[in-house]
Amino acid sequence: MEELSKQPPPPPLTQPPPPSSSVSIEEPLPNGKGGGAVVVNSIAKLPEEELLGSVTMHNCPGTRASARVIQKMKQDQTRPMTPPPSEREPNKKEEKAAQKTPSQLKTGSGKTTWTNVERNCFFDALNEFGKDFEAVANCINAKLKRRNANSDYSFKTKDQVRQHYYQTHHKICKYVRFSEELKKPAQELYTLINYGEMRRKLQFLTEKHFMKLKQLVYQGQITVRCKGKNIRIKTPSCKALRRLNQLDDSLEDIRLPSKVEVLVTPANMEAFGRVQSLAQNPRGRIIVPLHKKLISFIKTFEYKWRSANQRLHEEKSAYFSSSLPSAASNNNNNNNETEPLQPSVASLDPSMCFQPRPGVAIHRPLLSITAYLSSISICLTAYEERMGFKVRSETLGNLAGMSVAANKRLRTESGSEKRSPETKKPKSSASPPLEKSLDDGPLEGNLMKMENSSGDELGEEIHEFLGDILEAMQHPQAATIPALSATTGDTTNVAVALETSHDPVQQAYPANADLSNAMATSVLQTSCAAAPAPSTPVTGSLAAPSVARSKRKEAKEAAAAAQARNFKPLLSDDILKRIRKGWTQANAADITIGDLYVVFGQDSKLELEYYWCEVDSSTAMASSILTINTVTPSSSSVGTQTGSAASNANQTGASSNCYVSASSNSSTSSTSLPYNPNDCDSVERVRAVTTSSVSNKLKHLLLVANLSERVRKRQCNCGHTCDRKRDLMTKAQQLAEATATGGVGGMVEGNFRTPMLPVRRPISNIDPVRQLSALTRQKISRQVLVQRRLLPPTSAGDRPYDLLSVRQLHSGLFEPIDRVDGTSSAGISTSGSKPDCSMNAMTASQDQEPGDQGALEFLNDEATQVSARDMPNLDICVATNRTDVSSSLNEAAQDGSTTQSFFQGSMSPMHLLRDSTSNARWLEDNINDFSLTSLLGHLDEIDATRDILDPSSSMSVISESSVDFRHKFQEIAALLQQQEKD
């Protein structure tokens, strides 16, 4: 390269002349007059520079150069002097954008753009004002201005709204076909409002969705499958459609919440303790929508608060059902047949009942919840029926060239897992084909409305059905109930629904029911309008007489007039009682939470109380026996198991009846009163208190006063406590017999003592008068029966206190007691108490009468029989007391006078109280004060002067098996002083 650059320039023959070079360069130029000459001279005078990457500086034909470098040099030389068009386009676009801003658009240009937010405002305003373009434009502008005042939204005018209205309708009107009798504004409103609702629910609209727009317009509701979810779309109950249907506008100012807060609290102490025993909060709060069924609400809480026995029963039933042989299912050749039914798990718990809170105001609902939230009453079919059109839009055939989803082939069973729930249902809701006659149109429409109704429709079926029952009762000429009610202002729908749904047994048997229930049952069997439950099969007669169909409008108008004349502002007492009684799973029917909220709810809250109903003992026993026999595993087939269960039930019938009678007797013997009603002389008063569920407080007070002033025969020296202890013994004995009958049969001859269950009051016997309206944290007062035992005076035999054996004191607690009627209790002592019983007979024979000796011999015979049960005896007999004391003393020093001197008179406080002269005055003044202070103050009046040093007077009157240690210390001190003196 250096050698070539240092060579002298080539000869002039090879070097091109400057003019030719300048001419060759200036050939592509458009003009070479002035500027071209200058350019030529400048190019010729400029020294040639070496270009980077070039091989030679001159265009020598003999020198070979790279094609890439030459091409690059040519590109540099032929570079255009003007900028490319891509660099000039942005300036033009910016100029155009600057000229046309949304605020400077002309109204008549026809190129108005609508954003998504503006479209949403358009459809909202359309639902409110209908085909009033000026009002719609004002509503859109107000919403856009409220949304953001500084935004660049173009405020719409009346003409722009009209243009968008007709453009949108023109795009979607091809999917819906209307009757010729239907006016054009009604067609436009029904199409646009339903399209706006579908657009609001679905994010993207496809051709498949537009195919269902017709069904939404005709029937008022559809279900669309989108992104794996079933989305339910209903025709909105807006003001525009209500005004078009000429419906009552009284519901426009009423705003119900979409969800309400339900507060549940226990109705009594039994329900409170039942839930608290499960370690759960008895007070609950749940937020549910208005269309929530009451029966599912009850089932939720029943499952949540089921008892431990029910849980164990369910686990046991599941275990036994899984262990049953499945041979019967293998014998079925048909795959479509269902498997053999497993043993159903019977509920051991009583049914749960929900009732309104006491004191809440129950008023007649001023609106029909069905008319408020229902979309069927304002659909196109209902509008055409209300207007009396002869040809319905729904009966018209599909347009030519349109693909209809109903005419498509159903999917096969191979993809059954991927099928949507909509395809699994029968396709009876599709529009009829072209060859369907027009006369069958109304019948087909009714069928479609019935099968498309769902359980989530806020009980619209039952309320429309019950609302039309009143019309049928007032106007017997109307043979059938219309499919849709025109008088939506019926204020008795919810009340009648609550009333008639309480007694399903009477509805099933009209012979035992009143006229209204009989009419409800008869109309239910022949009705074609609405089914009370979504699972009701549509197999009844759907044909309605044409005469009744023609008179439907007149009957409704007459019913509305009669209702206006017979308007009752308040509910009857019978309906109030039924509502106050509450609802269980059996009589909840199709009532929803919205129905209850309309009747006695307020401020988006609904207060309910719950309790468990009492179950008949015979019914519960029979169900438990059948359940046990059914669940018992066996190797036979299902039919054999059923037969064995029936035979076992027949065999155990007698034993179950006996057990039921015993349990009923025990339940009647135990009452919910904190005292023994047997102590009262007035039988009528006791019967009134024990039989009434919520008794009067005055009866309780009178009964307490009667107990303190009663006069009856004394059976023993400790007369005021024996009867109550005998009642406790009777309850404990019956409980022990029931426990032993249940499963302690093999331990009759054993020497082990069976631990007994503590004697408790059953939960059902808690005083129902006490409610939980004002619960505080103070302790609940309990009526405790204290067993008091009096020690003998020391003057009898000059016997010290320490000789009294504690073992012998407690041994008397397990001795049988002597009953008033001559029979003894079933409590049997152990083998260790046999010497005490024999000594008891020996010592008691010295000073007892022959009658008492016979009773003691009978007790000794009973004591020799050893049993597996050992009843805790709460009573202490006279003979037992004598035996306990005499067994610890020297037998040589025992005589009759010493034994009799122990209990010369009863030293109980009540005995001293009755013997005093001021007994009547103290009872009158302190009838409600049974405190220890008042009792001791009364005793001080009897004997105010007592010597403290006297050992006999130092013993406490109400000492509880205790030892006077102060007197003992005095004796020890005196003994030590005597020893020091000696």
From Swiss-Prot:
Transmembrane segment boundaries: none
Effect of M402I: In strain: k5
Name of the encoding gene: crm
Protein name according to UniProt: Protein cramped
Effect after changing S845P: In strain: k8
Annotated effect of mutating M842T: In strain: Berkeley, k1, k2, k3, k5, k8, k9, k11, pe1, pe4, pe45, pe5, wi4, wi7, wi10, wi13, wi18 and wi19
GO biological process: pattern specification process; regulation of DNA-templated transcription; segment specification
Biased composition (Pro residues): 7-20
Tissue expression profile of the protein: Ubiquitously expressed throughout embryonic development. High expression is detected in CNS and gonads.
Biased composition (Basic and acidic residues): 86-98, 410-425
Alphabetical list of Gene3D superfamilies matching this protein: Homeodomain-like
Chain's role: Polycomb group (Pc-G) genes are needed to maintain expression patterns of the homeotic selector genes of the Antennapedia (Antp-C) and Bithorax (Bx-C) complexes, and hence for the maintenance of segmental determination. Can act as a modifier of position effect variegation (PEV).
Segments for region (Disordered): 1-37, 71-111, 323-349, 407-456, 822-851
Modified residues (Phosphoserine): S431, S437
Compositional bias of kind Polar residues: 100-111
GO cellular component, one term: nucleus
Consequence recorded when altering G639A: In strain: Berkeley, k1, k2, k3, k5, k8, k9 and k11
Annotated Low complexity bias: 21-30, 822-833
Organism: Drosophila melanogaster
Keywords: Developmental protein, DNA-binding, Nucleus, Phosphoprotein, Transcription, Transcription regulation
Domain SANT, first and last residues per copy: 109-173
SMART domains per record: SANT
